[in-house]
């Protein structure tokens, strides 16, 4: 039985079916998750190892390389990167999209544990994290109180951190700032030499005397009791009386050679919020976790902390989920605005509430049914899926308008409502199926692209496919059924001046179109040549740079990060002073809501995270504020390097990473010769500086820090019966101090363990002679380090970066107002002419843009091929579908000119807009072509058929184009959070729909008649 006839005959049954579908859709609506972007982040496993006191090259050789080698064989391995700094190694492995981060983290832990015995004994235990060490925190919180900073830090590093980590989706919480306590054993070097002792002797003695030993069990007739030797230190005073055996067997107390006291560790990290000292907590989400859900969990835990610690103030400085929520809310708002404006247009064109009501019932029904399919597919509500739904409005309206307009035509012939509904639907059944399947094959290639970009747009494409298929079903069932009920008494034409004028306008438009079309058919050359010229000019605008291209539009996310870098050798105190000057300026900027300062253990570097007020509460956008900050830094901070980055979560999400402050232009130099890499990086930096449109240039290589190099004399080691390890232990202990255990459950430290550190008194002020005088215990007694090794001054690297086990230097910068493609093209020419001896390649957005654009071009080509094949099957002709294919070039004319007029660019979103436009404009061509063939089969000549088809389909074609344009205007004109990404796509669709609609009604008839004349038997 015909499905349309069944729907008309069984209205109650159809209503019940759609009520069930809507119930399932609404249930799904409340169960679908929410996030900014589809989860296409590459998954990472990071290994962090601290090696106190070790140089960069020592850490690289002894820690980084062995771990890199071991992790390179891990499951789902994609690539390994590392950053090695003095005393710290960060190795992070990028995994493929199929990886289970939890399982791979377990595997990584096992692999690192297996080689632990081959790593230096003095390293801290390696930490394996389910995130990239370069990932950006999703929430940054500052804790302040009237208590001392050491008390704040103690609570933050234990209770606060632990509480926040309980939130689902949290991978890690970094605590910065404040002060940590320690029991410092500061040794008098001269007294130590006098008694013939070394620092290692003290370290060993402290460790041996600070133990809990289980001694077994004792038994009575009724009980078994364990015996435990309790010998842990309770207070620093106990350590002071520790007995040491000096030279000649003489015993002394530790207090005779050292001062033992509880104190704050030397400040190597500062943190402030809005100029007040604080402890910062940076929350990182696990790979694959939902940002909104994770942030909700963190904020809930934060509320419990506020209740449990009323004397503490917790300030949320940065919360990425705010932008996510605002962006999604605004996307949903534009969707609803588009729906309302579409309804108004329909009311005017369909003459009254009945037809409009039929469409306004059909559209939400299709959308609600789509929720159910999205839920089954595991989709979330994000910018892409909601954007797909917003675009669907035009597609869904299109289906309903075509059906209702044709039903109106049959009603005007005097047929009953039931007959008109059935025959009106069936007459255009083939065209409807063709149009719907065209939409499906347009978006399927996008949905199944394998790259990160393809995965990013998967939900966008499939959401449109789901909605389009549901719309097709609705147009065959619900819409005809509603029409048969609404028009039971025929079409009631509304009365009044407005409707009369609309009728007159419609009749005049059709008459003028008839005249114009006949003139174009009689003299087609001018129109065809004009269209070809317009197409050539439009396409030329892109390579000429008049319409620029970039990877992604910039977004104002109300957040800025400032990184400062002082000349090499400056310490944390000096870096802190520079940041204090910066804070004085920021406190006076009215657009800023909060700012948080961090100076970390990389002593000559610091950062500021700046949260701006919401966009509707400030007069300047984020780029204007950032530029003013750059100007201040240039005028007031002298030689200090300052980089200002606008935080961009919506851009990095597409490129598969979460470093929200990474620059769009990056060049990586690779090679084994570090000196050559350094020389080439200086050339690249100069090229960047001489290229217009670039700012915030940063070279990852920093001139080495001054260092003292100790070169052992192996002959002397042999003579004194000493080893390299003896020298290393004594040297490291003297310079950086060594841990000698902990003061367990220290009541003075909120019950936390307090580190016991052994070092020389005044150890931070060593010169070369002090180093040579460091005592080393050998087989022949205690000697000076200078007796065993040569000590000389030198320079060592600050950071060594590696990619896939090869050293690299990264040079990056931000853009001003030049399109990314122009900059990359110019840089490529300059770099090729520079005579670089190292291998170079672009990374970041430049690479992603080229790859994504190429893949999008392939998807567009595949879509066109699939559409052609589909139409060839439906029409059983190889020439007829060829006519329809001209709809896209006709649309591209308006799309590119619209980008030019609105100052937008070719980017990933505007390319998607071209794909969407292709599916939409194809409907007009298919509708016109299908009715022309129908009339020819009824006996009309080709010319008469094409003119009559144009006149008959003018109204539905114009209505669908207008509703699509009006429906897209709220998106195109939006100034809300996150709208920047959608604007270019909306203008492409608007411009493409306008020119394609006009030219389709004129050019396609000419092309059809020309092909009919040339190949009469094949059309």
Predicted regions and their residues:
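Helix-loop junctions and hydrophobic alpha-helical segments within the transmembrane domains
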Residues: 317, 324, 328, 404, ...
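Transmembrane alpha-helices and their membrane-interface boundaries in multi-pass membrane transporters
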Residues: 393-407, 429-448, 455-499, 608, ...
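Structured binding elements
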Residues: 47, 164, 460, 985-986
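Extracytoplasmic/periplasmic membrane-proximal domains and adjacent transmembrane bundles
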Residues: 6, 37, 48, 90, ...
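Hydrophobic transmembrane alpha-helices and their membrane-interface caps
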Residues: 24-30, 35, 340-409, 466, ...
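Solvent-exposed, membrane-proximal periplasmic/extracellular interface segments of envelope transport
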Residues: 58-130, 190-211, 232, 573-661, ...
């Amino acid at each position: 039985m015909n499905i349309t006839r069944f729907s008309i005959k069984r209205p109650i049954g159809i209503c019940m079916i759609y009520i069930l579908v809507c119930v399932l859709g609404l249930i799904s609506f409340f169960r679908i998750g929410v996030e900014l972007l589809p989860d296409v982040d590459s998954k990472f496993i990071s290994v962090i190892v601290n090696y106190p006191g070790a140089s960069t090259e020592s850490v690289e050789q002894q820690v980084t390389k062995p771990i890199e080698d071991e992790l390179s064989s891990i499951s789902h391995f994609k690539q390994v990167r590392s950053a090695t700094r003095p005393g710290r190694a960060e190795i992070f492995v990028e995994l493929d999209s199929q990886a289970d981060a939890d399982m791979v983290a377990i595997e990584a832990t096992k692999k690192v544990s297996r080689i632990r015995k081959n790593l230096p004994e003095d390293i801290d235990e390696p930490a394996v994290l389910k995130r990239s060490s370069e990932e950006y925190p999703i929430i940054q919180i500052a804790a302040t109180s009237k208590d001392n900073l050491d008390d704040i830090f103690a609570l933050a590093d234990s209770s606060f951190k632990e509480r926040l980590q309980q939130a689902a989706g949290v991978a890690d919480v970094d605590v910065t700032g404040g002060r940590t306590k320690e029991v410092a054993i500061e040794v008098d070097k001269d007294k130590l030499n006098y008694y013939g002792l070394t620092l290692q002797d003290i370290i060993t003695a402290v460790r041996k005397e600070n133990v809990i030993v289980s001694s077994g069990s004792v038994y009575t007739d009724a009980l078994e009791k364990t015996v435990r030797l309790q010998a842990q230190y309770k207070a620093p005073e106990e350590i002071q009386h520790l007995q040491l055996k000096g030279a000649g067997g003489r015993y002394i107390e530790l207090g005779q050679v050292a001062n033992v006291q509880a104190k704050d560790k030397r400040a190597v990290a500062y943190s402030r919020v809005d100029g007040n000292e604080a402890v910062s907590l940076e929350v990182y989400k696990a790979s694959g976790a939902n940002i909104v859900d994770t942030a909700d969990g963190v904020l809930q835990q934060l509320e419990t902390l506020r209740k449990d610690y009323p004397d503490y103030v917790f300030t949320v400085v940065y919360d990425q989920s705010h932008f996510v929520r605002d962006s999604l809310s605004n996307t949903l708002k534009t969707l609803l605005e588009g729906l309302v404006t579409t309804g108004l247009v329909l009311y005017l064109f369909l003459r009254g509430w009945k037809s409009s009501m039929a469409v306004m019932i059909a559209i939400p029904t299709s959308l609600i049914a789509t929720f159910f399919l999205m839920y089954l597919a595991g989709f979330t509500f994000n910018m892409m899926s909601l954007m797909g739904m917003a675009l669907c409005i035009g597609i869904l309206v299109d289906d309903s308008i075509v059906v209702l307009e044709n039903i109106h035509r049959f009603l005007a012939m005097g047929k009953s409502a039931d007959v008109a509904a059935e025959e009106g639907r069936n007459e255009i059944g083939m065209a409807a199926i063709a149009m719907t399947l065209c939409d499906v094959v347009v978006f399927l290639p996008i949905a199944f692209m394998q790259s990160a970009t393809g995965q990013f747009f998967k939900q966008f494409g499939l959401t449109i496919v789901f909605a389009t298929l549901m719309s097709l079903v609705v147009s065959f069932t619900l819409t005809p059924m509603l029409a048969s009920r609404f028009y039971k008494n025929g079409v009631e034409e509304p009365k009044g001046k407005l409707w009369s004028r609309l009728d007159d306008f419609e009749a005049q438009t059709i008459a003028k179109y008839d005249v114009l079309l006949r003139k174009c058919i009689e003299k087609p050359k001018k129109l065809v040549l004009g269209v070809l010229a317009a197409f050539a000019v439009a396409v030329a605008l892109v390579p000429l740079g008049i319409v620029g291209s970039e990877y992604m539009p910039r977004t104002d996310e109300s957040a800025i990060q400032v990184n400062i870098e002082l000349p090499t050798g400056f310490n944390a105190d000096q870096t802190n002073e520079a940041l204090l000057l910066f804070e004085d300026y920021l406190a006076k900027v009215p657009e800023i809501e909060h700012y948080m300062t961090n100076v970390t253990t990389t002593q000559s570097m610091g950062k500021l995270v700046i949260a701006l007020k919401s966009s509707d509460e400030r007069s300047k956008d984020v780029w204007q504020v950032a530029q003013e900050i750059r100007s201040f830094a240039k005028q007031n901070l002298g030689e200090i390097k300052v980089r200002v980055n606008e935080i961009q979560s919506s851009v990095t999400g597409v490129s598969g990473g979460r470093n929200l402050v990474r620059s769009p232009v990056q060049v990586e130099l690779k090679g084994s010769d570090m000196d050559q890499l350094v020389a080439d990086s200086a050339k690249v930096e100069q090229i960047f500086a001489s290229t217009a449109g670039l700012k915030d240039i940063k070279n990852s290589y920093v001139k080495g820090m001054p260092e003292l190099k100790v070169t052992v004399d192996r002959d002397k080691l042999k003579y004194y019966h000493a080893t390299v390890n003896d020298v290393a232990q004594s040297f490291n202990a003297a310079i950086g101090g060594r841990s000698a255990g902990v003061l367990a459950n220290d009541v003075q430290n909120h019950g936390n363990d307090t580190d016991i550190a052994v070092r020389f008194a005044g150890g931070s002020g060593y010169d070369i002679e002090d180093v040579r005088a460091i005592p080393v215990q050998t087989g022949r007694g205690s000697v000076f380090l200078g007796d065993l090794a040569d000590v000389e001054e030198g320079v060592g690297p600050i950071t060594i970066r590696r990619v896939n086990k090869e050293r690299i230097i990264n040079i990056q910068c931000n853009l001003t107002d030049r399109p990314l493609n122009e900059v990359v093209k110019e840089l490529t020419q300059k770099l090729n002419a520079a005579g670089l001896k190292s291998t170079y390649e672009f990374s970041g957005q430049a690479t992603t843009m080229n790859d994504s654009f190429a893949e999008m071009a392939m998807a567009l080509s595949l879509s066109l091929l699939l559409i052609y094949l589909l139409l060839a099957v439906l029409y059983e002709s190889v020439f007829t579908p060829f006519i329809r294919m001209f709809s896209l070039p006709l649309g591209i004319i308006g799309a590119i000119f619209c980008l030019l007029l609105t100052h937008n660019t070719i980017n990933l979103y505007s390319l998607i807009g071209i794909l969407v436009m292709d599916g939409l404009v194809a409907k007009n061509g298919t509708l016109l072509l299908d009715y022309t063939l129908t009339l020819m089969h009824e006996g009309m000549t080709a010319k008469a058929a094409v003119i009559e088809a144009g006149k008959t389909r003018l109204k539905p074609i114009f209505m669908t184009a207008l509703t699509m344009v009006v429906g897209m205007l709220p998106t195109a004109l939006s100034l809300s959070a996150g709208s920047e990404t959608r604007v270019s796509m909306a203008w492409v669709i608007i411009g493409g729909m306008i020119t394609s609609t006009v030219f389709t009604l004129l050019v396609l008839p000419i092309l059809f008649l020309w092909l009919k004349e040339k190949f009469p038997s094949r059309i």
